[in-house]
Amino acid sequence: MSFPVTRLRRMRQSDSLRSLIRETRLTPTSFIYPLFVCPGEGVRKEIGSMPGVFNISVDEAVEEAREAKSLGVGGIILFGLPEKKDEAATGAWIDDGIVQRATRAIKREVRDVVVIGDVCLCEYMSHGHCGIVQKKSSSAGNASPSKRGSNGGRSAVATQAATEVEYEILNDETLEILAKTAVSQARAGMDIIAPSDMMDGRVGAIRKALDQAGFLNTPILSYAAKFASGFYGPFREAADSAPQFGDRRSYQMDGANLREAMREISLDVKEGADMIMVKPAMPYLDVISEARRRFDLPIAAYQVSGEYSMLQAAIRNGWLDRDRVILESLTSIRRAGAQLILTYFAKDAARLLG
């Protein structure tokens, strides 16, 4: 049947009717709230490019986790800002690292909160890359790792033109550090391990290490399709993790490639991922949708810092209605097929949903 018998506006006449037939619903339990944890006590420093988001000390992280839990938010994910950085990413895998300390404190003080650990090395490496960096030598068989000068600046090696040709992120050597980091986080009480580095084989290496350490029931949420995106800028300020040279396009995905994203997801599933993630969310809704069509495991999506800051800028200038665009943006991600959404709006959205 068609018009005038069929009138789709009939079911749009009131809030109650619209709610009755709504196809996509948001719930606070589907949100994951990111926290940036730094050294100190009583620290709550707003991030300039992310209004309303803060670098916080462990004690403040406990209170944030408590509030998020009280609002029904599904979980939190921790990112660490270590006191010192080095080329072994020591702060990522030592048992007294900032994320490990925060995890123990939160699990001790906030009952039943789900804590997810981001496993990446960029925040902990002095050069800001997600793996071990080696400079390719002009003569065969002779290469040396990049070094930072004693004054904190780049050394002669690092100040040379940093291109994809001259520098290499060592994939297999990085896996050992990632695995150590995952086990250390699990020992601290982390509920879910979430590798975001985009090294080949990291899920399998982490799964093996967790199992050997006795953490057979600790699930892995893999950042399986993480794209080399321009939307990460504010996060890199928040986590002090911008690369000191070059970029991350040799390991993060090309944003033009949908089929390759499906291969990445498939490989991570075969290696033992229990859940997968697409990052960023908004520019890659088609990737989320295709992943939902092909795979039957839980799918997460990250509404990243650039998405958040872009909306916040328009909201603060009065160009967009705050409450509407928060929920509309999250609904689009959910409608595309994401079961979980990592978002800096988690607490705000939970309050709006009541």
Question: Which residues are covered by each model-predicted region?
Answer:
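Intrinsically disordered, low-complexity sequence elements enriched in Ser/Thr/Gly/Pro
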Residues: 5-10, 20, 139, 146, ...
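General helical structural elements
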Residues: 22, 70, 152, 156-158, ...
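Alpha/beta enzyme core
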Residues: 42-46, 51-137, 163-297, 302-354
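Intrinsic disorder/low-complexity segments
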Residues: 137-165
